[in-house]
Amino acid sequence: MLRSDSPVDARLSICAIYQDEAPYLREWVAFHRLIGVERFFLYDHESTDTHREELAPFVHDGTVLIQDWPVNPGQREAYDHCVAEHGHESRWIAFIDIDEFLFSPSDESIAEILSEYDHLPGVGVPWAVFGSSGHKTRPPGLVIESYTLRSARPRNSRWFKSIVDPRGVVRAMGPHAFSYRDRNYAGPVPEFVPFERLRINHYWTKSEEELRQKLMRPRADTGAAYAPTAERALTITSAETSVFDDAILRYLPALRETLAATAGSAA
């Protein structure tokens, strides 16, 4: 049961489940710290790579908590566990993946944006889906600088993720939506934040090489294999990701500085 009578420690936290994402974890955590995320509740789904070494600086300073999670498929269960065990520690929790980067294109404080929705138990944040940007193999740069071609605005109701008030949540319905104690809402979320103010850059494919590696793993939400082949996924994303977008690059200089600093403190 969520301990709703306890004071919160953070305004905004992130919950995510991952498997063998070591090459991307430091960038992802460091970026979200820059935009105001204070805590990370991360569920390790039987990784065999160097993820703990990559996360060591953030674990050491108390920013990241790693939970071993050998549950299959595990994503929805991890989200429910996070709400029950850590919901009292944060006013808002964003439930996103390691290939998703939350930020404000209008350069507003995310905490201030969310304060406008304090009367709601959750909000939906739209995706901007990025493709390979022509990369056949993993490029040497960071994720946010390597991929700059995205799709147009979200085309259907599943192109979003949720940021919730844990006290208003009953359970996760899947990777995108939750059921809420107050059921007086039509649709998957109580309200969507405008795309121009808050969004998630979703680097789903990355390079062709990385996409092929990704599709070899089972889905975190169902445990099933990914439906599209790599060729089919690349064909779809290449055709649909033609909008140049570098709004997130305003964070690049600060992100590089942060990564340089944490590299020296890695265990």
What are these regions (language model features)?
Residues 23, 71-77:
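A short, glycine-/small-residue-rich helix N-cap motif at loop->alpha-helix starts
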Residues 44-60, 71:
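A conserved acidic beta->alpha catalytic loop
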Residues 80-92:
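Active-site nucleotide-sugar/metal-binding loop of Leloir-type enzymes
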Residues 38, 91, 121:
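Short acidic/polar active-site loop segments enriched in Thr and Asp
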Residues 90-103:
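Short beta-strand-to-loop acidic/aromatic patch adjacent to the donor-nucleotide binding site
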Residues 1, 77-80, 104-267:
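Catalytic-site signature of metal-activated, phosphate-bearing donor transferases
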Residues 1-30:
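N-proximal low-complexity "stem/linker" segments adjacent to membrane-targeting elements
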Residues 30-39:
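Short, acidic, metal-binding catalytic loop of nucleotide-sugar glycosyltransferases
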